[in-house]
Every structure is written in C-alpha cells, then in structure tokens.
C-alpha cells in the first residue's frame, strides 16, 4: 500500500534549487512523506532512493537522505540507478520486499540535482603527457546520451519519429497542452496534496519559500512553440519545447503492508498491483511505456479499457503520443494535470512523482484503477498498476 507521499516543487536547471544536493532534496521529500503519512521515522525499516547522477554526490546518497530526514542509523538504505525508471523501480522493489515479508514499512523514492552534476576528467588518474584534454559533462554522458548508439537520446527519438511519423504540429500541440494543464492544476490546488515547500536560505533575513514548479509556462501555445528551432536535427521535429525539462527535485512515498497500516489505524492512497518491466528490441524509447503497461495489465488480469488514471512520463511529447496511439488510450485520462514537459524531469525522481500523482488522483476519485509508466535509457520500460485504497 502507498500510505502517503510528498515531493518538492521542481526547480529548473540552475534555478531555485541550485544550491541543494540531491540528498538534501531527498531528505526534504522523505520527511514530508512521513509527516503526511503520520508515520514516525522510528517505524521505517528500509529506505530505497533512485538517483542517476551520483558522481560527486558522496557515498550512499540514499543513506545521506535517510539520515538527514531523521531516520535512524540502524535503518539500511539502498541507492538504485535504472536511469529514468529509478523512482518507479524503488517503489516496485519496496512492494516486493514487503510482499516477501522482509519488511513492513519502507520509504521509497527518487532524488536528483541535475544542476549539481559535475564535469568529468576521464583518465586523469594515469596522467596526460601532451595535448588537449576533454572534459565530459556527467549529466550528458551518464544521463542523457545513449551509450549504445553514441548520440543524445533526443537524436535517437528523432530517428524513431521518422518511423512513427508524428508531425511537428502534433508534438507542439501536445507540449503546449502539458503546460496549460499543469498551470490549471496549480491554480486549482491539485498539487497541494503532494508538494511541500522548500525553505531557501538567504544571505540576510528569513529564508524564502519555494512552493511551485518553476518550469511551467501558463501562456504556452502551439503557435509559440512552432517558432522554436529543431534541437537535434536540422529537419527534425523535436524542439526544446517538446522535450522534458532538465530539472532538480525529489519525491518519496511510504509503502506499508495492509496489516501494519490497519494496526496503526492508517488509511492508504492506493494499493500497488502488478509491475511490468520490459526492454528492447533496441534502445529507442517511444514504445517502452506502452509495452510495460501491456505487460502490467496482463499480469494484473485486466484490460486497457479498465484504466481510469494514466500517468506517462513525458520524456518527449513523441513518447506520450506513441503510448496513447499504441495502447488506444483515451487522451482525456492521460496526464490530466500535465507532465514532465511542463513540470520538469529530474531523472531519478520522475518515476516516484508520477506514481504518487496517480495514487492521489485515485484517492480523490475514491475508486478506480490507474497506471504509472516510463521509458528509460537503453530501451527499457516500467509500469506499475495502482488501485484506489
């Protein structure tokens, strides 16, 4: 069961959260999740946090976050890296451990500071005798560059668009709608149940409170996006506007078995169902969420038309569009409050963010079935079925 969860507002690259490490953001999210669950830190038995960009982050980022959140030194922690799938995999692993009776209470989530990703001087340990030296960007090299085809994942997605035939206007319209829906959701207070403010210290005076995702542009239109240049190929259809934003943030959920929750007198947002995990046949991204959802649906024994809430990570507009088309989804139930194109995509966090958001939607409905799904670098996909608590 997902008892409760919390996330930070998402900051833009070099934005409001630029001075926070991933672990510091993770600690804020963990503490917030425990408070929303009304669960004391002393009950937590294990912590699992996803993080992709760990170079320079120090030993055991998940444990750093756990200890900073007030969880005891006697509680083990695990940092996992499955690229964009890390945050959803953390929840799935927590569920599996609880079902195996290893633990009763697990905190799972994801954290990322893409701003803090350092640059890498490869082979420096063996020294350089002569000539120029190349410095690599950890964010690009270990986060956004496809290792199998040696090109940015956006360029790889552009290649697949040649097959899928999504037009520039289709992608621009989808991206504009993501911003518009996210802006409307903030205005209507939809995110209030999940976002906790972050206090940002100032040189003098009281800290400022960072309270809202800062990448959302309420006045975004498809016409405005049509003026952007292609990002990965001169004749391409993907722009900075139809790709997810580079961002900082963290999210966490409290996962618990039903017996423990009942013993503590707690309610829960959603019950965790089947987990769909897929890969291949190559490293492209577009079909992976749909493939993972199909696998999860099959394991759950339900059909796609039984889904009420669908959250698909908007790595690119083309990924969400492919998922909708391949599954035959009603677009009206997909990312109803916007997605990563608008709010941002801190790599290790996003899987937890969309799972929490789907769980909260189901809780507000009081019934129904949902799914959260993402594509991941290397051509992988994960999906998690949720049922209203």
UniProtKB/Swiss-Prot annotation:
One GO MF annotation is: acetyl-CoA C-acetyltransferase activity
Active-site residues are 84, 345, 375
**Corresponding gene?**
fadA4
Alphabetical keyword list? Acyltransferase, Transferase
Q: Which CDD domains match?
A: thiolase (cd00751)
Query: Which source organism does the UniProt entry give?
Result: Mycobacterium bovis (strain ATCC BAA-935 / AF2122/97)
Q: What is its EC number?
A: 2.3.1.9
**InterPro entries named in the record:** Thiolase (IPR002155), Thiolase-like (IPR016039), Thiolase_acyl_enz_int_AS (IPR020615), Thiolase_AS (IPR020610), Thiolase_C (IPR020617), Thiolase_CS (IPR020613), Thiolase_N (IPR020616)
Q: Does the keyword Zinc apply?
A: no
Class of the enzyme per the UniProt entry, highest EC level: transferase
Listed under catalytic activity are:
2 acetyl-CoA = acetoacetyl-CoA + CoA
Gene3D superfamilies to which the protein is assigned, alphabetical: 3.40.47.10
Cystine links in this protein are none
PANTHER family according to UniProt: ACETYL-COA ACETYLTRANSFERASE, CYTOSOLIC, ACETYL-COA C-ACYLTRANSFERASE
Q: What is the similarity comment for this entry?
A: Belongs to the thiolase-like superfamily. Thiolase family.
The superkingdom of the source organism is: Bacteria
Which Pfam families does the entry mention?
Thiolase_C (PF02803), Thiolase_N (PF00108)
Q: This protein is called what?
A: Probable acetyl-CoA acetyltransferase
UniProt keyword Acyltransferase present? yes
């Amino acid at each position: 069961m997902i008892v409760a969860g919390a996330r930070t507002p998402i900051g833009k690259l070099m934005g409001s959260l630029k001075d926070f490490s991933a672990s510091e953001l993770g600690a804020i999210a963990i503490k917030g999740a425990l408070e929303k669950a009304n669960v004391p830190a002393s009950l937590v038995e294990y912590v699992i946090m996803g993080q992709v960009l760990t170079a320079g982050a120090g030993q055991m980022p998940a444990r750093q976050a756990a200890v900073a959140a007030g969880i005891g030194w006697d509680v083990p922690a695990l940092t996992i890296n499955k690229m964009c799938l890390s945050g959803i995999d953390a929840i799935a692993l927590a569920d599996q451990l609880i079902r195996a009776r290893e633990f009763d209470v697990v905190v799972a989530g994801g954290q990322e500071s893409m701003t803090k990703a350092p640059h890498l001087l490869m082979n420096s340990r063996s020294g350089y005798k002569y000539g120029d030296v190349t410095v690599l960007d950890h964010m690009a090299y270990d986060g956004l560059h496809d290792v199998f085809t040696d090109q940015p994942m956006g360029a790889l997605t552009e290649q697949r668009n040649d097959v899928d035939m999504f037009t520039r206007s289709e992608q621009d319209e989808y991206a504009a709608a993501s911003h518009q829906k996210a802006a409307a959701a903030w205005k209507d207070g939809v995110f209030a149940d999940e976002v906790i403010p972050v206090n940002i210290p100032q040189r003098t005076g009281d800290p400022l409170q960072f309270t809202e995702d800062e990448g959302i542009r309420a006045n975004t239109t498809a016409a405005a996006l049509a003026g952007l240049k292609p990002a990965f190929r001169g004749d391409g259809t993907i722009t900075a506007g139809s790709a997810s934003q580079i961002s900082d943030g963290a999210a966490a959920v409290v996962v618990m078995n039903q017996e423990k929750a009942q013993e503590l007198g707690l309610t829960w947002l959603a019950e965790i169902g089947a987990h769909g995990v897929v890969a291949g046949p190559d490293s492209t991204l577009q079909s992976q969420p749909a493939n993972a959802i199909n696998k999860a649906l099959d394991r759950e024994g339900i059909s796609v038309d039984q889904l009420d809430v669908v959250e698909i990570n908007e790595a690119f507009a083309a990924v969400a569009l492919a998922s909708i088309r391949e599954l035959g989804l009603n677009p009206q139930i997909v990312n109803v409050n916007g997605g990563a194109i608008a709010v941002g995509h801190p790599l290790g966090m996003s899987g937890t963010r969309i799972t929490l958001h789907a769980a909260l939607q189901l809780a507000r409905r009081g019934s129904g079935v949902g799914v959260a799904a993402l594509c991941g670098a290397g051509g992988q996909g994960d999906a998690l079925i949720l049922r209203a608590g």
